[in-house]
Amino acid sequence: KVPRQDAKFSLLDLISKSLESNSTELKDGDILCISSKFVALSEGRYVKLSDVDVSSYATEIAEKYNIDPHLSELIVQESDKIFYGFDGFVLTFKDGILVPNAGIDTSNIMPGYAILYPEDSFKSAKILKSEIKKLFGTDNGIIITDSRLMPTRIGTTGVAIASSGVKPIEDERGKTDLFGNSIRVTQKAIADDLSSAAQLLMGECDESVPIVIIRDSNLLVSDNDQSSQTFSVGFDECIFIKGLSNSKI
């Protein structure tokens, strides 16, 4: 649990103070799951909505889907692709993730502001891993997390938007199942699974728990660099998007 932050701050300093106030020390192999919005806030990635100039395209989206025009403009600027929308939301592709409103949030931020994703989540994770090792002398993994919706399911789960030092995917292809059948497509989303576990403690409201330490996971912590290509496929390869695009229903 950490104090509420209302402006840009040093994430490393806050982690250090939080460990001390919670009488906790990091150990080699610990994995830190950190809220993407908390990382973004530490980097100053928040915007006063009234300061955003609205384009005609953003106005069109705002009117069509009942979205604040200034928020709509941020969605246009931040999205890698916009698919479609419904009342209050548009479905977008951002940093390898299918996410509403380009991951932009107006909750857990000062009224009248919106908080974005970190500028470069993988770079942020890598730098933080290095800084923690210098400060504490421990080798830790970093996962930057967010909450997400799953098709046809009620409620949110966790998703990893970036990591450093944690192998995000375990490839099961080529192995055999209980009956000797060859596994053809299965790859375990390790970083996403850990993010979902952390999400149970982080919550979505006023819990003030943006950082969760995962210990004794038996996962190897390494210095391998990651990218969005390590985590995800392009939207043109996504089974949900392709399936719905080709649906004749």
Name each model-derived stretch:
Residues 1-249:
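N-terminal and secondary-structure boundary signal
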